[in-house]
């Protein structure tokens, strides 16, 4: 776990010290792979490399969007979509199961400048909950939707809906 923090610090440092951004506002990207415990003693070198590569790729996605003058919201959404789509992390595919053996997902987004916010909670079928949270912020009068109402809203918004089996992976 210590190596992950070191990698994140190095990546943030390289983002803020890039000569291509002279005269522009510096930025950093900080990510994590979800809640839970991953013990180094239980991880092979190959497995650790897989986790590190996925985390690094997620940061690169957001970095490239910002580097190309993209929107911060898009950088956050695409970075988190990547993590949600990876079975290695506890966000989206690969999530921890409830006591009933199902997956319930939460996501939230806030724009620090405007203070606009959107969130979804206890969703079961939205492939990328962060995208649903952003849709709540942009396309509804609400700040948060939960459960079936949030799943229905996401479907109405054209987001990808998947079966519960999509999220369940072997660990």
Locations of the language-model features?
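Bacterial Sec-dependent N-terminal signal peptides
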Residues: 1-24
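Alpha/propeptide regions of enzymes that mature by internal proteolysis
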Residues: 19-171
């Amino acid at each position: 776990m210590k190596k992950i923090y070191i990698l994140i610090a190095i990546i943030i440092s390289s983002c803020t010290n890039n000569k291509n951004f002279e005269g522009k506002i510096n930025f950093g990207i900080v990510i994590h792979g979800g809640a839970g415990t991953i013990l180094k003693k239980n991880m092979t070198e190959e497995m650790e490399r897989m986790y590190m590569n996925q985390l690094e790729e997620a940061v690169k996605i957001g970095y490239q969007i910002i580097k190309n003058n993209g929107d911060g919201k898009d950088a956050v959404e695409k970075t988190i979509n990547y993590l949600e789509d990876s079975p290695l992390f506890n966000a989206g595919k690969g999530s921890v199961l409830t006591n009933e053996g199902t997956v319930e997902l939460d996501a939230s987004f806030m724009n620090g400048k405007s203070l606009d916010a959107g969130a979804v909670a206890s969703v079961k079928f939205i492939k990328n909950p962060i995208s649903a949270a952003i849709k709540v912020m942009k396309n509804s009068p609400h700040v948060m939707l939960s459960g079936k109402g949030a799943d229905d809203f996401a479907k109405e918004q054209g987001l990808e809906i998947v079966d519960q089996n999509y999220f369940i992976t072997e660990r």
